Amino acid sequence: MRFLHLSDLHLGKRVCEFSMLDDQRYILEQILSLLDSHPVDAVLLAGDLYDKPVPPAEAVRLLDWFLTELSHRELPVFAISGNHDSADRVAFGSALLAESRVYVSPVFSGPPEPITLTDAHGPVDLYLLPFLKPAMVRHVWPDAPIESYNDALACVLDHCSPDPAHRSVLVAHQFVAGAASCESEEPSVGGIDWVDAALFDKFDYVALGHLHSPQKVGRDTLRYCGTPLKYSFSEASQHKSVTFVELGEKGSVTIAAEPLVPQHDLRELRGSYMELTDRRNYEGTAVDDYLHITLTDEQDIPEALARLRVIYPNLMRLDYDNRRTQTRQELDAPAKAEQKTPLEHFADFYQLQNNQPLTHEQAVFCQQLIETIWKEEDA
C-alpha cells in the first residue's frame, strides 16, 4: 500500500508580510501532478493545515480546492490538526467528509480508533492523533500522573493497542527528541514539549508533522516530511520534497522523496550595494525569488530597500553586516535581557508556549505572584 506523506501546509502563511497563497496553490498543483504520475492509495496530512487558528477565507478555499481535487482522484485522505490549527475548526463537518473518505481527526477526547484499509498483503490500520498538550490529556484522564508532553503522549498511546498482526500507521504532530528544528517553527523553550521516539515503537510507520525540515528520527519509519515550501530564511539551504511511503508485507517499508520546485525560491544574497546592482551579476538570475539581502557597505545606502526592489521585486528583508552592526549586536544582546522585568520575561515565555499573549488579568495575577515571592525572600 502506497501513501503520500504531507504536513505543515501552513495555508494563509505570510513571510515578512508577503502572502504565500499564490505560491502555495502553485506547489499544491505540483503535488497533484506528482500524484498523477506516482499513484498512491491514500494521502496523509500530518497537521498545520493552516498557519493560524482562524485562517483567512482564501486559505480555507485553497484547502477546500485541494481536498476536492484529491477526492476527484478517489484518494482517501487522513488529516489531523496541528498546533497552528484550531482543532474544532478543522474537525468541522468531519462526519460528512468521512462519507467522501476524507478522514479528519476529531477534537481530542481519548485514544484514536483505527480506520482500516486493505490491500493484497492484508489490513492496514491508520490512527489519527491531533496535536496534544498535557492539559488535553489530563482532561480525559484526570487521575493520570501527567506533568509533561512526554507523559501525555505516553498515556494516550498506552491506551492505544494496534493489532500486531496488522500493519499500523500513526499520523501525529509533536516534537520528537533528537529531531532538528529551525526558526520558522513555533519556538520550544527548554525542550519541554519534546517526546521520546520510543513511544512510537508499536507502529510500522509514523507520519509526523510539526518540524519543517524533512528527516527521520532514529529509525527510517519515524519521519517528518517537512514543509512543501520554505517559510523562513533559516530554511534557505533546504531542499523541499514530498515523501512517498510503501508498505509491503508486515515489516517491509520503502520510503522515497520526490523533489518540489517552488514558483519562487527563498534565498539569501550578500555583497556590497555596487555588486548587487551590477547588471553583470544579476542578469540571467532569478531576480523575482524571495530574497534576504545583506549589504556589506560600511555606510548606509539611502533608500536602499526601494532601490534594490527595482531589480529584486520580492526582496523581503534587508540587513547590513559591517563593523557598526557587529559592534551593536555585541552590545545590545546582554542589555536587552537585563532591561526586561521578571514579568516581561515570563510574558515572553508564555507567548512562545501558547502562541498568544498574556491577558491583562493574567498579567496582573502574575505580577502579584512575583511581588509575593520577592516579599517572602526579603523577609
Question: How would you name each of these model-derived features?
Answer:
Residues 1-68, 72, 361-372, 376:
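N-terminal active-site segment of His-dependent metallophosphoesterases
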Residues 8, 28, 43, 48, ...:
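Divalent metal-coordination and catalytic microenvironments
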Residues 35-39, 119-121, 162-165, 284-286:
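Glycine-rich phosphate-binding loop signature in dinucleotide/nucleotide-binding domains
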Residues 37, 42, 247-379:
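Accessory, non-catalytic peripheral segments of nucleic-acid enzymes
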Residues 55, 84-218:
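His/Asp/Glu-rich metal-coordinating catalytic cores
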Residues 72-77, 166:
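A short helix->loop->beta-strand "cap" motif at the edges of active sites that frequently abuts
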Residues 75-80, 102-103:
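Hydrophobic or amphipathic alpha-helical targeting/insertion segments
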Residues 112-124, 129, 222-287:
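Binuclear metal-dependent phosphoesterase catalytic core
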